[in-house]
Swiss-Prot record:
NDH is composed of at least 16 different subunits, 5 of which are encoded in the nucleus. Keywords: Chloroplast, Membrane, NAD, NADP, Plastid, Plastoquinone, Quinone, Thylakoid, Translocase, Transmembrane, Transmembrane helix. It holds the Pfam family NADHdh. This is NAD(P)H-quinone oxidoreductase subunit 1, chloroplastic. The chain crosses the membrane at residues 30-50, 98-118, 129-149, 248-268, 300-320, 343-363. It is found in: Plastid, Chloroplast thylakoid membrane. The gene is ndhA. Its EC number is 7.1.1.-. The lineage of its organism: Eukaryota, Viridiplantae, Streptophyta, Embryophyta, Tracheophyta. It comes from the Eukaryota.
């Protein structure tokens, strides 16, 4: 069998073309992931700056002003400083659990961002079980906190880890029941379908008006999941020094610091998606999505508008969360557990039964 030179060149060019296609596919798969990571990083920096400015305004202070214009680079400067701090390990603690705990807390939160739709086109994973995947993944974070508290071999750290686990379990159930009510209303567990179900009547189509009780319960539960005041018992300075973070320093302490703000950003995004209409402009008959489906340029414009609307609603909720920190006093541990088990759980269960009844009657 004789193979001519031209045939060999054709075979080589074919394999080269196939390898280029594989490389292009890998790069195209990494682009949205890297874009999401970059956006999350910028979002966390903005939240830290906003919290410092709003807190300074409430307390009548100046706030950060030297690190960049208006102090916008202060969070970046703090993060850079933590990178070069010494990484101290407890001599009698479990170093494996001590090191793995912060990573579990951060990774579980980062994975949850994959089901957040920033616009009709921009979502990393549009799954049929999107919101329940978020609940399942977010349930892993308290395990990391408990591991950190136990591995530190410190009574304050261990008590902080136990408090974090108890608080998360107490408020995870009402949160799940509220999400289940939204899923019943939208006839879907996909985050994209939930947003589209709210787009028919603009502002009045939001689940906020159809689920006011669920919205309030979700709001309180999400604040408790983020361990924000008045629910910051796992790291109460007056009682536990810094809770499960007491023995940490350097980059590991920075991971916990970032995880708290990532969780706050994630909760705010889910409030926007589940109750505030997501990327929809929410003015009926003014914004027609079909206008932005004509060509690629219009599609990019529509995606940009959707991202802007989603972030605007998200940062509105963030402002409420930050203002709440300086408004309400911290609860006692028994008050926190009673609020979760004796108040929010029955209300969320009743809300779910009402939603189910209305859905059955409407069939």
């Amino acid at each position: 069998m004789i193979i001519y030179t031209t045939e060999v060149e054709d075979i080589n060019s074919f394999y080269t073309l196939e390898s280029l296609k594989e490389v292009y596919g890998i790069i195209w798969m990494l682009v949205p992931i890297l874009t999401l990571v970059l956006g999350i990083t910028i979002g966390v920096l903005v939240i830290v700056w906003l919290e410092r400015e709003i807190s300074a305004g409430i307390q009548q202070r100046i706030g950060p002003e030297y690190a960049g214009p208006l102090g916008i680079l202060q969070a970046l400067a703090d993060g850079t400083k933590l990178l070069f701090k010494e990484n101290i390990l407890p001599s009698r603690g479990n170093t494996r659990l001590f090191s793995i705990g912060p990573a579990i807390a951060v990774i579980s939160i980062l994975l949850s961002f994959s089901v957040i739709p920033f616009s009709s086109r921009l979502i990393l994973a549009d799954l049929n079980i999107g919101i329940f995947l978020w609940i399942a993944i977010s349930s892993i974070a308290p395990v990391g906190l408990l591991m950190s508290g136990y591995g530190s071999n410190n009574k304050y750290s261990f008590l902080g880890g136990l408090r974090a686990a108890a608080q998360s379990i107490s408020y995870e159930i009402p949160l799940t029941l509220c999400v289940l009510s939204i899923s019943l209303l939208s006839n879907s567990s996909s985050t994209v379908d939930i947003v589209e179900a709210q787009s028919k009547y603009g502002f009045w189509g939001w689940n906020l008006w159809r689920q006011p009780i669920g919205f309030i319960v979700f709001l309180i539960s999400s604040l408790a999941e983020c361990e924000r005041l008045p629910f910051d018992l796992p790291e109460a300075e007056e009682e536990l020094v810094a809770g499960y973070q007491t023995e940490y320093s350097g980059i590991k302490f920075g991971l916990f610091y970032v995880a708290s703000y990532l969780n706050l950003l994630l909760s705010s995004l889910f409030v926007t998606v589940l109750y505030l209409g997501g990327w929809n402009i929410s003015i009926p008959y003014v914004f027609a999505p079909e206008l932005f489906e004509i060509n690629k340029i219009n599609g990019i414009i529509g995606t940009t508008i959707g991202i802007f609307i989603t972030l605007a609603k998200t940062y509105l909720f963030l402002f409420i969360s930050i203002a709440t920190r300086w408004t309400l006093p911290r609860l006692r541990m028994d008050q926190l557990l009673n609020l979760g088990w004796k108040f929010l759980l029955p209300i969320s269960l009743g809300n779910l039964l009402l939603t189910t009844s209305f859905q059955l009657l409407s069939l």
